C-alpha cells in the first residue's frame, strides 16, 4: 500500500512554495519447496525455504520558486529527505539429501545438511538482516535572463547537496 501527498501555495504571481510526499510499503512472504537430482554429487536433494521481507520508502520534498526582480531573475530551491528500509526478520532454509543408491529404499531417510564450522545461508541455516538508508538533499538555482541581440537568452547557476547515511546489519546462523 502507499500514500501520496502534494500541495502548493501560490503566494502571488512571482512566489510559489510546495510540499510533496510519497510513502510506500510492501511485503513478501515466500515459501519454497524444491526437490530434484544433483547428478554431479550423485544424490537426490530436497530443500525448503521460508522468507518474509518488508520494504518501506518515504520521500519528502519542500520547494519554492521566486521571481526576485521585475526583469525576471528567478530563484528556485528545494530540499528533501528520503528514507528507505528493508527488513528480513527471519529467512530459514533447510537442505536434505539422499544418495542415488538409497532412493529406491523408502526406509532410508533423507539426511539433513548441517554446515560444519561456519553458517551457510544458501543450504541450511537462518539469515536476518536490516537495511536503513537516509538521503538528505538540497538544491538552489538562480536563472538570469538577458538579450543577445534580439534573442532572449538565460543563464542558470546553481548547486546541489546530497548526504547519504546507510546502516546495514546482517546475521547468519
What do these predicted regions represent?
Residues 1-5, 56-62, 79, 134-140:
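Hydrophobic, lipid-facing positions within transmembrane beta-strands of outer-membrane proteins
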Residues 5-11, 66-68, 144-146:
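Residue-level signature of outer-membrane beta-barrel architecture
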Amino acid at each position: 500500500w502507499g500514500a501520496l501527498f502534494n500541495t502548493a501555495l501560490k503566494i502571488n504571481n512571482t512566489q510559489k512554495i510546495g510540499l510533496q510526499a510519497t510513502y510506500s510499503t510492501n511485503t513478501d512472504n515466500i515459501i519454497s519447496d524444491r526437490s530434484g537430482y544433483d547428478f554431479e554429487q550423485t544424490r537426490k536433494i530436497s530443500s525448503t525455504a521460508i522468507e518474509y521481507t518488508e520494504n518501506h520508502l518515504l520521500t519528502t520534498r519542500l520547494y519554492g520558486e521566486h521571481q526576485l526582480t521585475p526583469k525576471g531573475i528567478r530563484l528556485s530551491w528545494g530540499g528533501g529527505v528520503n528514507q528507505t528500509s528493508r527488513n528480513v526478520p527471519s529467512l530459514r532454509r533447510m537442505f536434505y539429501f539422499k544418495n542415488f543408491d538409497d532412493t529406491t529404499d523408502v526406509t532410508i531417510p533423507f539426511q539433513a545438511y548441517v554446515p560444519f564450522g561456519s553458517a551457510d545461508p544458501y543450504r541450511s541455516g537462518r539469515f536476518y538482516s536490516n537495511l536503513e538508508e537516509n538521503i538528505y538533499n538540497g538544491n538552489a538555482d538562480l536563472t538570469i535572463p538577458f538579450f543577445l541581440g534580439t534573442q532572449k537568452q538565460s543563464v542558470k547557476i546553481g548547486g546541489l547537496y546530497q548526504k547519504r547515511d546507510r546502516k546495514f546489519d546482517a546475521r547468519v546462523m
